[in-house]
Amino acid sequence: MLKEYIIPQCHILIKIGKKDHMQLLLNEGEVYMNSTEFFRTNKNEEIGDEYEGAMCIKNGKVSDSRENLDFEKLFCMWHINNINPVHDSLIHRIEYDKESDSTRMTIDLRKLSNFTPNEESYAVVINNVREFNRRFKLACEKNKLQYHGNKVVKYYDPEKISEETILTPFWKRNSYDKQQEIRYFIEKADKEPLELYLGSLNDIATIINVNETAIVVQGECR
């Protein structure tokens, strides 16, 4: 039986990973950003995608890629809001709560925990998205980084997308749509991962064990 972490609003960010990494994110605001090239060549099917970095798709295949993929630094998180509903595969149950006269949706994050060994899957749940975004932008300004903002990922079907469509780092194949990503994009002219520190997030986030706790959204979110 999973414990419940109840969220009163339908706008959250979630980062899943190993416990020590998630504690660094919560306590120090450590944002670890890998490059598009890292994601393009990673063999873990939950993380890597050979179509990352694609600029154009023709007949379902990558016909052209962007340059300097090592310079594109990405921070990716799972997200939900009132516009982007939760993927059906992640919904454990939906029920009506008479006492609060609202809908309760239980989300099972174990379906996303293949990012790390199952017993080590922890999640940082960010409840104040606007404040997180403000701190992220501020950290970029302090470090004089070329920040291109954050966007919800647009998922595409490689068999149907037009050859004329120019893809950006905010596009991804629809076979990954359950990840419901929002991406933060920085350009930095070196090949190393980028570490950015936002400061403690304890006032706007919490950490949970994915294998012990389900997310419960109290209110309409579909």
Where are these regions (language model features)?
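NAD-dependent ADP-ribosyltransferases
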Residues: 1-222
